[in-house]
Swiss-Prot record:
Disulfide bonds: none annotated. It is a multi-pass membrane protein. Converts a single cis double bond at position 12 of linoleate incorporated into phosphatidylcholine into conjugated 11-trans and 13-cis double bonds. Produces punicic acid (18:3(9Z,11E,13Z)) from linoleic acid and conjugated octadecatetraenoic fatty acid from gamma-linolenic acid. No activity with cis- and trans-vaccenic acid, alpha-linolenic acid or homo-gamma-linolenic acid. 16:2(9Z,12Z), 18:3(9Z,12Z,15Z) and 18:2(9Z,12Z) are substrates for the conjugase to form trans-Delta(11) and cis-Delta(13) double bonds. No activity on the cis-Delta(9) double bonds of oleic and palmitoleic acids. It comes from Punica granatum (Pomegranate). Belongs to the fatty acid desaturase type 1 family. GO terms for cellular component: membrane. A motif (Histidine box-3) lies at residues 328-332. A motif (Histidine box-1) lies at residues 118-122. This is Bifunctional fatty acid conjugase/Delta(12)-oleate desaturase.
Amino acid sequence: MGADGTMSPVLTKRRPDQEINKLDIKPNHEVDIARRAPHSKPPFTLSDLRSAIPPHCFHRSLLMSSSYLIRDFALAFLFYHSAVTYIPLLPKPLACMAWPVYWFLQGSNMLGIWVIAHECGHQAFSNYGWVNDAVGFFLHTSLLVPYFPFKYSHRRHHSNTNSVEHDEVFVPRHKDGVQWYYRFFNNTPGRVLTLTLTLLVGWPSYLAFNASGRPYDGFASHYNPNAQIFNLRERFWVHVSNIGILAIYYILYRLATTKGLPWLLSIYGVPVLILNAFVVLITFLQHSHPALPHYNSDEWDWLRGALATVDRDYGFLNEVFHDITDTHVIHHLFPTMPHYNAKEATVSIRPILKDYYKFDRTPIWRALWREAKECLYVEADGTGSKGVLWFKSKF
C-alpha cells in the first residue's frame, strides 16, 4: 500500500524526460477566462482520475528526486561563484547591472529548492518518511522557512482547499468583512502599493502573524507552538523548527560580522527576498481567479475544492520551479505525486476533467493585476446556491 492509502500498482515504464518536457499540458483551445468553472458535483470520482493516470506517475524515486536537488544545488553554487568571483571585477556600471541578474537567477533557483522542500512535506520526495523530513527540514530551514509548522498548516490547506471557513491561506473575505480602508486602496496607486508590500513581506508575514490566513483565537503564528494551528502532538516539532531557524540566523549573523552586511544582503538576502515574492505570486495566482468558486460548509466537499485551482504558464520558469506553476491542479488532487510525473498525469486526466480543468494563458504580470483588481471579496451571486461564492470587486 502506498503512502497515500492506495494499493501499489504494477509500475508502467516512465517516459523519458525529453518526452515529458515536450508534453503540452495547455488546452488546445483558448479558455474564456470570464467563463466560470463548473461548481456542481463532478460526474467523476477521484478513483476515476487515478485510474486514468499511468501507475508509474505515482512512483516516488529517491534517486530521481535527488537528481533534481543536485541540479538546483549545482546552479546555486554556479551563480554564487560567478557573483563573488566576476562581478567585483566589472566596472561599476556593469556591476550594478550584473547584481540584479544574479539576484533574479539565484532567487528563482531558490524557489526550485523551496518546491522540493515542499514536496518533502507532502512525502513526495521518496518512499522514506524520515528521509523526506530530514531533507525538507534542511532545505526549508536554510531558506528561513519553519519546515514542520508549514508542513502541518499546508497539509490542512490541502484538506480544506477553497473552504471559506476552514482553508488555511488566502482565505477570501466576505463583502461585510472587508476593512473600510481597503476602499481607499481600490485604485491604481493603491493596488501598486498593496501588491508591492504583499510581494515583499507577504510570505514572512504569513509565517509570523498568519497574515491572509484562517482566523484563529489567540496568537496564530508558525513560530508559536501553542497556536491553535497545531495540535499537541505537533508542538514538539514546532520547537525543533524554531531551533533550526535560530541556528540559521546565527550563521547569518556570523557571516555578516566576517564578510559584512552588504555582502550578506547581496549574496543571500536579496535572493531570499526574490524567493519570498515568487512564493506569494505563485500561490496567490493558483487560488485566485474570477472564474473559480469558493464554498461554504453547505456546499464544500474535498474534490470540488481541490478542482477549484488554476494552472498558469510562467514560460521557462515552469521548469526552474519544477512545474508547481503549471501542474497545480494535479498536485491538489494527488499531493504525494512527485513533480517530475505531474505533466504526464495532467495530460492523462484532462479529457475527464473537461471544463473542471482551468489553464489560464494570461501573462503573469497582467494576471496579477487583474486578480488584484477583481478578486477583492466573495459572495453568492443570487443565481444559484448560497453556498457557492464568487469573487467580486464592486463596493
